[in-house]
């Protein structure tokens, strides 16, 4: 029951990309360009959260057009990419969205 109370406080979900929104595989074109495989259901989850008033924000170490393109297609408003220390972005998000740490969920490493 305690966990359900925590979920009700959720106002924002932060998520990593690799091994969370992708299968973690490394794919390359014949020209050596990197590709990622996203699952459609992950986008559906982000949409359900958005419709409930809970934005999903991507925070990732990588800086690729692929992630931004997928996020745009899935109506994910914000992508913080190239973030080497993911914890460093939390105060910025807290200020921007006027939330406490107890109201932020995170999926990733």
Predicted segment positions?
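Short coil/turn segments at beta-strand junctions that form active-site/ligand-binding loops
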Residues: 9-11, 54, 102-103
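Non-catalytic pre-domain segments flanking phosphatase-related domains
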Residues: 1-17
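Conserved Lys-Pro-Asp/Glu-containing loop-to-beta segment of HAD-superfamily phosphomonoesterases
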Residues: 90-109
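Feature captures the catalytic cores and cofactor-binding loops of soluble hydro-lyases/lyases
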Residues: 65, 83-92
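Chalcogenol-based redox active-site neighborhoods
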Residues: 20, 32, 73-74, 99, ...
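A positional/architectural concept
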Residues: 21-51, 61
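Substrate-recognition element of Asp-dependent hydrolases with the DxDx(T/V) motif
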Residues: 46-70, 80
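Short hydrophobic/aromatic-enriched beta-strand-loop microsegments
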Residues: 76-84, 103-106
């Amino acid at each position: 029951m305690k966990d359900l109370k925590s979920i009700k406080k959720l106002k924002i979900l932060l998520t990593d990309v690799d091994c969370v929104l992708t299968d973690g595989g490394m794919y390359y074109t014949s020209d050596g360009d990197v590709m990622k495989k996203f699952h459609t259901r992950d986008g559906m989850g982000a949409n359900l959260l958005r419709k409930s008033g809970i934005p999903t924000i991507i925070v990732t170490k990588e800086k690729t057009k692929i992630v931004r393109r997928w996020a745009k297609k899935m109506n994910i408003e914000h992508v913080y990419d190239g973030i080497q220390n993911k914890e460093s972005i939390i105060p910025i998000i807290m200020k921007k969205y006027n939330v406490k740490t107890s109201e932020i969920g995170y999926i990733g490493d």
